UniProtKB/Swiss-Prot annotation:
NCBIfam families: PRK00124.1. Belongs to the UPF0178 family. Disulfide bonds: none annotated. CDD domains: PIN_YqxD-like. This is UPF0178 protein Sfum_1097. PANTHER family: UPF0178 PROTEIN YAII.
Length: 153
């Protein structure tokens, strides 16, 4: 079990929470980015810096994540690749991507992208605050607990 983090766009409070969770539960966490990121030093936390370029971080995570791992990302196309592989995918706001909802999320994302490209006005990202941080924490804890139970820990 490993936690993969699409770290370029991950909010700082979520990164901090992941580091604390990894230390507390001794789960390896890997922060993947195409730029320098500052992550506290820890035996179970590491960073991987990939080259600049579109989708390079996503490709790295997709290649290395295995069934039973966790990935934290807001990239829906990446989630749509990982979920069928048996990777638990959570966005930084605490939404769990599943076999049941990933196709709909990808369809909405593609529609909104088409709308933006056609010059349509789409809403910007919602504000990120304590409520979102708590929802993420709750979802991550719940999913890790499920995984430990499946493994008999």
């Amino acid at each position: 079990m490993r936690i993969w983090v699409d770290a370029d766009a991950c909010p700082a409070p979520i990164k901090e929470l992941i580091v604390r969770t990894a230390r507390r539960l001794r789960i390896p966490a890997v922060f993947v980015a195409n730029k320098f990121i500052s992550i506290p030093d820890s035996a179970c936390v590491s960073t991987v810096r990939v080259e600049l370029g579109p989708e390079i971080v996503d490709e790295y995570i997709a290649k290395h994540a295995e069934p039973g791992d966790f990935t934290i990302t807001q990239d829906i196309p990446l989630a749509s690749v990982l979920v069928p592989k048996g990777v638990t995918v959570i966005d930084p706001r605490g939404e769990l991507y599943t076999e049941e909802n990933i196709r709909e999320r990808l369809s909405i994302r593609n529609f909104m992208q088409d709308l933006r490209e056609a010059g349509g006005i789409t809403p910007g990202p919602r504000q990120f605050g304590q409520k979102e941080k708590q929802r993420f924490s709750d979802t991550l804890d719940r999913e890790i607990t499920k995984r430990f139970k499946l493994q008999g820990n």
